[in-house]
Amino acid sequence: MLDKTLRMNYLFDFYHSLLTEKQRNYMSYYYLDDLSLGEIADEYDVSRQAVYDNIRRTEAMLEEYEQKLRLLEKFETRRSLLAELRKAIASDQAVEACNSLIDRIEKLD
């Protein structure tokens, strides 16, 4: 399992277009630029609690999008299968293993 920051960064990459501009800005400042709640609050002239609440709600939204669309899950599965494919190519049973992995990758979508 990915640590929370890395997971949120991935979810943000996949689903940022579904967020409002304010949500994108808060998440970007907090997770990508590593700004504190206080720094973000100063930038937007709001309370730290308002920033915290917005970020937590946005995190929940991103998790909900992932439950429905599973883009991160498919990405991780695809990456894992491609790593197996690279390993299989280097082995003796390359043809059978590669065909099997290709079939699994094709079934992801």
Curated annotation (Swiss-Prot):
Might take part in the signal recognition particle (SRP) pathway. This is inferred from the conservation of its genetic proximity to ftsY/ffh. May be a regulatory protein. The lineage of its organism: Bacteria, Bacillati, Bacillota, Bacilli, Bacillales. Coiled coil: none annotated. NCBIfam families: PRK00118.1-4, PRK00118.1-6, YlxM. Pfam families: UPF0122 (PF04297). This is UPF0122 protein ABC2295. Belongs to the UPF0122 family.
